[in-house]
């Protein structure tokens, strides 16, 4: 959430930044006007409360002197009525301010490229060269069915579209991948967490999914619970409402969890395969950092995600997302896209973001600076390390062989009992 004081004092700069994210200046002008009304009403109510205190003292003195205080009592009752009217106006204005400020996206960092959509993202670097095949390649969904390791038909029967069963060596490959990913992140100083797979609405607000993106989630009717769309939500909210000792920062968390997405608005997109599912595993990275180090931490986090792809020897590229393509809470985001041969393109497999103090303000996550003893908002970062199902898709396609088998990447073989190939059964 943005700082209302910052909008008030640096209106033009904030408006210019938010314009690049599709927010009209009229919205901010309305917000500014409401803020001015609110502050004026606060002055009025404080003046009336001061008058009420004077009237109360006059009544007490009159009673001590056994004098008639009926006029003072009438005056105080009128003051109380006026205060009540203003308080009601303040409550309405506060609600209007909240309805606007809670759906404003984060302001982009100065280094973020300005653009409207994914076409304006900027490629930063590439790693690895896509393999040149001398045979007709198959898509990962065809490979998965032929190898008897992925079963969409029964997934659709048991649940519905965009669900599947991993089976046999498919299940082992998935498990090997997320164990490998977690082990690599632990080497980089991350603490492993197994979080709840349901969170409450306050947690969804804290990380920015609520109120704006409720349609993208699965809520449990009649409860305060939501199935997590990403482990970012429980991991970040671990410290919601807390004050952390500054000496403990930075703090790194990692977790493997299922992620649940309604995929609202994705009808007709990626209807086959592992790219877009309602339920998928993802290894998440979350960091809590001081503001002065958070952008160094973003580079490290991105490198952590890249390290996984490099160890798996999967070609990828890194993009700096433009202002129009970044997520709601992000101030800066790098996307990692892995090469998918059957689609002859790169597809997103990780997104690493610095939200600065945007989530911390919503969730009230603060730290006590050991230098001056002051309590301040910290910066939160999050990133995929990696999306497991999409990594399975990339391995199946990049490591496929002419005979229909798939070579298991070397780094995963210790996790799969030394197996080197997934062969047709």
UniProtKB/Swiss-Prot annotation:
Assigned EC number: 6.1.1.11
Pathway: Aminoacyl-tRNA biosynthesis; selenocysteinyl-tRNA(Sec) biosynthesis; L-seryl-tRNA(Sec) from L-serine and tRNA(Sec): step 1/1
GO terms of biological process kind: selenocysteine biosynthetic process; seryl-tRNA aminoacylation
Residues the entry annotates as binding ATP: 261-263, 348-351
GO molecular function: ATP binding; catalytic activity, acting on a protein; serine-tRNA ligase activity; transferase activity
Function as written in the Swiss-Prot or TrEMBL entry: Catalyzes the attachment of serine to tRNA(Ser). Is also able to aminoacylate tRNA(Sec) with serine, to form the misacylated tRNA L-seryl-tRNA(Sec), which will be further converted into selenocysteinyl-tRNA(Sec).
Record family assignment: Belongs to the class-II aminoacyl-tRNA synthetase family. Type-1 seryl-tRNA synthetase subfamily.
Protein name: Serine--tRNA ligase
Gene name tied to this protein: serS
């Amino acid at each position: 959430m943005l700082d209302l004081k910052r909008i008030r004092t640096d209106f033009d700069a904030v408006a210019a930044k938010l314009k690049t994210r599709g927010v009209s200046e009229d919205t901010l002008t309305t917000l500014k006007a409401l803020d001015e009304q609110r502050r004026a009403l606060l002055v009025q109510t404080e003046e009336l409360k001061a008058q009420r205190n004077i009237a109360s003292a006059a009544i007490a003195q009159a009673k001590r002197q056994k004098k008639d205080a009926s006029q003072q009592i009438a005056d105080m009752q009128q003051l109380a009525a006026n205060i009540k009217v203003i308080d009601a106006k303040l409550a309405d204005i506060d609600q209007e301010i909240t309805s606007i400020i809670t759906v404003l996206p984060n302001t982009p960092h100065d280094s973020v490229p300005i653009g409207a959509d994914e076409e304006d993202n900027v490629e930063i670097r590439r790693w690895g060269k896509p393999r040149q095949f001398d045979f007709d390649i198959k898509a990962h969904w065809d490979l998965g069915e032929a190898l008897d390791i992925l079963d969409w038909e029964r997934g659709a029967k048991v649940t519905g579209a965009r669900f599947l069963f991993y089976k046999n060596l498919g299940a082992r490959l998935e498990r090997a991948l997320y164990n490998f990913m977690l082990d690599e992140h632990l080497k980089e100083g991350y603490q492993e967490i197994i979080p709840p797979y349901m969170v409450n609405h306050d947690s969804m607000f804290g990380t920015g999914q609520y109120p704006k993106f409720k349609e993208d989630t699965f809520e449990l009717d009649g409860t305060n619970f939501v199935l997590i769309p990403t482990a970012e939500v429980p991991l970040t909210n671990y410290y919601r409402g807390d004050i952390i000792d500054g000496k403990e920062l930075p703090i790194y968390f990692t977790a493997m969890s299922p992620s649940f997405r309604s995929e609202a608005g994705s009808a007709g997109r990626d209807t086959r395969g592992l790219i877009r599912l309602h339920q998928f595993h993802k290894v998440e990275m979350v960091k809590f950092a001081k503001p002065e180090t958070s952008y160094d931490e973003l580079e490290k986090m991105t490198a952590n995600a890249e390290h996984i792809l490099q160890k798996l020897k999967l070609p990828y590229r890194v993009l700096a997302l433009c202002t129009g393509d970044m997520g709601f809470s992000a101030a800066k985001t790098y996307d990692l896209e892995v090469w998918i041969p059957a689609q002859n393109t790169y597809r997103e497999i990780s997104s690493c973001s610095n939200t600065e103090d945007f989530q911390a303000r919503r969730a009230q996550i603060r730290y006590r600076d050991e230098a001056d003893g002051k309590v301040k908002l910290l910066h939160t970062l999050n990133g995929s390390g990696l999306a497991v199902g999409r990594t399975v898709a990339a391995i199946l396609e990049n490591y496929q062989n002419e005979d229909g088998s798939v070579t298991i990447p070397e780094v995963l073989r210790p996790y799969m009992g030394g197996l080197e190939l997934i062969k047709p059964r």
